[in-house]
Amino acid sequence: MTKGPVRLDVAVSYALPRAGLPSAVSFRKWVAAALKGRIREADLAVRVVDEKEGCSLNHHYRGKDYATNVLSFPAELPEGLPKGIKMPLLGDLVICAPVVAREAAEQGKLLAAHYAHLTVHGTLHLLGWDHEDDKEAEAMEQLEREILADLGIDDPYAGEH
């Protein structure tokens, strides 16, 4: 765990009308909560997309023919950087607004809480967390619960296990 303030640069872009979508300030708050105590500085991008772009990206990068709620693209540092130079570039998050809205409605969740959860979830992926097996999934879900609780958001996994 790192202590002290986080230097954070979150570029938020919207590929569809912003009405009803979280503000850039909200996305920054959620990313900062996920990074708190884990990393001192980070630059990342959040792009909110429609279903067509979400499906295209999921197909291209994961071979899946459907849009998913969040995609995480960790940054890869270029070869040949002098030793000791650490780039704060963390990566990119792509959040598919129609999928998030549909899931929130189907699961009876507040839309803003679901966006917060998926932003935290995606940011943790950028930090190297994963859920490929049950042990990893439980550890990641517990961390998500703690981060969201700090934000005043209920357990997103309540009733699932």
Curated annotation (Swiss-Prot):
InterPro entries: MetalPrtase_cat_dom_sf_prd, YbeY, YbeY_CS. GO terms for biological process: rRNA processing. Its EC number is 3.1.-.-. Its cofactor is Zn(2+). Single strand-specific metallo-endoribonuclease involved in late-stage 70S ribosome quality control and in maturation of the 3' terminus of the 16S rRNA. The keyword Cell wall biogenesis/degradation does not apply. This is Endoribonuclease YbeY. It comes from Xanthomonas euvesicatoria pv. vesicatoria (strain 85-10). Coiled coil: none annotated. It is an enzyme of class 3 (hydrolase).
